[in-house]
Amino acid sequence: MTEQRIIASSSTREDDAADASIRPKRLADYLGQQPVREQMEIYIQAAKARGEAMDHVLIFGPPGLGKTTLSHVIANELGVSLRVTSGPVIEKAGDLAALLTNLQPHDVLFIDEIHRLSPVVEEVLYPAMEDFQIDIMIGDGPAARSIKIDLPPFTLIGATTRAGLLTAPLRDRFGIVQRLEFYSPQELTRIVIRSAAILGIDCTAEGAAEIARRARGTPRIANRLLRRVRDYAQVKAAGHIDLPVAQAAMQMLKVDPEGFDELDRRMLRTIVEHFDGGPVGVESLAASLSEERGTLEDVIEPYLIQQGFLIRTARGRMVTPKAYLHLGLKPPRERAPGIGEPGDLF
């Protein structure tokens, strides 16, 4: 099983505690995602002007990009309360009914990992989203009866990293759909500088930029790296973070300038050295790395593919010339035609 990686985009308990102190409260402080910010500002102002609950919002994108943070910002801008839960926590229809009936008019209900709602719970959610009503079964057996409960107008914000797993009926009930994109190094630099100021960390612009460029386009990773570099600077550099200190800390953490850690590099090196650059089937690769297939597909591969170091083909995984150069190796001459073309899956 893979241990927690410093560059993992999934949240940890430390991340949750630290993020609460640096989380922006207003859209003006929410850095990056400019198209999303501009659209949400219009939707929020329009809903407030009409005195209505804002339409339901679906936010999707890779983990660590600020979906939960954006939900807090939306509730703050609307001037209403936010109730936070997640799909796996809502096990029964009664759990959802309890949440919905305790909402005040125009409140925001945030459901993280909404793709993990059970079908039974989803059925209760449909009329709640459309008509602000829920049907509850009272009693058992022949004496059971259904009663309708009216709900106050509310805004549901659903967040997911797996939008493709949402059922069509649920997806169609969201009037506003927003996709969060990876951040540019410049945007992440601004985020690191802002976080450092809030946390009282002495960090130069060059030091912040060095942290940002290795953060894989993800604010959660940038803030986590900032905390680890702060630890290094506190012991080795009197608490001051500049470019050399940031670079030395990253070398200690084994995070290279591309944002890769040892597991990323090991995967690329394995494909090059053991499988002649590929293509190699994912099961063979997982066995060679002593990792689970799911870890490769969901944790390691996405960023390597996004950055152009790895490609998926019908015949398996292949590294690109960019990967050879990153490993300090000479790329092979152009492969024979047909390599990487659709063919045998095994």
UniProtKB/Swiss-Prot annotation:
Localization per Swiss-Prot or TrEMBL: Cytoplasm
Region of interest (Small ATPAse domain (RuvB-S)), residue spans: 184-254
Transmembrane intervals: none
SMART domains xrefs: AAA (SM00382)
UniProt-annotated binding residues for Mg(2+): 68
CDD domains named in the record: AAA
GO cellular component, one term: Holliday junction resolvase complex
Superkingdom assignment: Bacteria
The entry's keywords: ATP-binding, Cytoplasm, DNA damage, DNA recombination, DNA repair, DNA-binding, Hydrolase, Nucleotide-binding
EC number(s) from the headed UniProt entry: 3.6.4.-
Family annotation (SUPFAM superfamilies): P-loop containing nucleoside triphosphate hydrolases (SSF52540), Winged helix' DNA-binding domain (SSF46785)
Main location group: cytoplasm
Residues that, per the record, bind DNA: 293, 312, 317
A single GO molecular function term of this UniProt record: ATP binding
Subunit structure: Homohexamer. Forms an RuvA(8)-RuvB(12)-Holliday junction (HJ) complex. HJ DNA is sandwiched between 2 RuvA tetramers; dsDNA enters through RuvA and exits via RuvB. An RuvB hexamer assembles on each DNA strand where it exits the tetramer. Each RuvB hexamer is contacted by two RuvA subunits (via domain III) on 2 adjacent RuvB subunits; this complex drives branch migration. In the full resolvosome a probable DNA-RuvA(4)-RuvB(12)-RuvC(2) complex forms which resolves the HJ.
NCBIfam families reported for this sequence: PRK00080.1, ruvB
Stored HAMAP family: DNA_HJ_migration_RuvB
Family indicated by similarity: Belongs to the RuvB family.
Name the UniProt record assigns to this protein: Holliday junction branch migration complex subunit RuvB
Phylogenetic placement of the source organism: Bacteria, Pseudomonadati, Pseudomonadota, Gammaproteobacteria, Lysobacterales
